[in-house]
Amino acid sequence: MRQLLFPVAALFLNACTTTPVPPVDPQQAWVDFTTPTPGSKLVMAQRLDGKNLDDGRFFQFPPGHHELMVRFDFEVPAGGGLGGLSQMMYRTCFMTLEYDHFRAGQHYVLEGRSLAFTPNIRLYDSARQLLAEERSVNCL
């Protein structure tokens, strides 16, 4: 039984990593994610206008006002050891951002950053202009 478990698990993991991202719809706004902070693990779409999403790799939606909720996982010092910084643990935060002027065909980037225990997200347009920052942060 154990010998069968590993190949089946590998098959499911492979399916998750090879699912293609759908093509960009020019009639909608598109938001990708990035995290330049060392120790940042994940920025993922969680909700759009209060509704859970099926695919957390991106946001794609009609133009106008929208509220985006993202999940952001990043490393923080866990204490212990010399100076209390030898062990790390992951912190998970859910952050909400609102923006009124999403435009059709425009590509946006949502950037997750952390400074120690303090996370933030910023929304940029394709010219790297800052458009919005998070309005609420809830961490576990």
Please give the residue ranges for each predicted region:
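Short loop/turn and low-complexity linker motifs enriched in small/turn-promoting residues
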Residues: C16-L140
